[in-house]
Amino acid sequence: MSRSLRKGPYINVKLEKKILLMNESKKKSVVKTWARASMISPDFVGCTIAVHNGNKFIPVYITENMVGHKLGEFSPTRQFRGHAGNKKK
């Protein structure tokens, strides 16, 4: 279910502040965040954000196609090992 239009998108305040400061200074550096639920806004385009997946930080380069999605969508938390197969004798 999508978020109410009355509430607006959720963007972590600290993350947004770091991105705005980085855009003003025109220095491109990786920003670490644990805020996987934050929505990607147009201000984030061109930045690299390291999103925590529970174990390590996954660097995510933000493009225009990612606007409107959440940061956690681009940092998988589980590793698929494959289904069980037939054991050969």
Curated annotation (Swiss-Prot):
Domain of life: Bacteria
Keywords: Ribonucleoprotein, Ribosomal protein, RNA-binding, rRNA-binding
Matches recorded under Gene3D superfamilies: 30s Ribosomal Protein S19, Chain A
Gene Ontology molecular-function annotations: rRNA binding; structural constituent of ribosome
Record InterPro entries: Ribosomal_uS19, Ribosomal_uS19_bac-type, Ribosomal_uS19_CS, Ribosomal_uS19_SF
Record GO cellular component, one term: small ribosomal subunit
Gene Ontology terms: biological process: ribosomal small subunit assembly; translation
S-S bonds: none
Membership in a protein family: Belongs to the universal ribosomal protein uS19 family.
Annotated PANTHER family: RIBOSOMAL PROTEIN S19P FAMILY MEMBER (PTHR11880), SMALL RIBOSOMAL SUBUNIT PROTEIN US19M (PTHR11880:SF8)
Role noted for this protein: Protein S19 forms a complex with S13 that binds strongly to the 16S ribosomal RNA.
Record-given protein name: Small ribosomal subunit protein uS19
Lineage per the UniProt record: Bacteria, Pseudomonadati, Bacteroidota, Bacteroidia, Bacteroidales
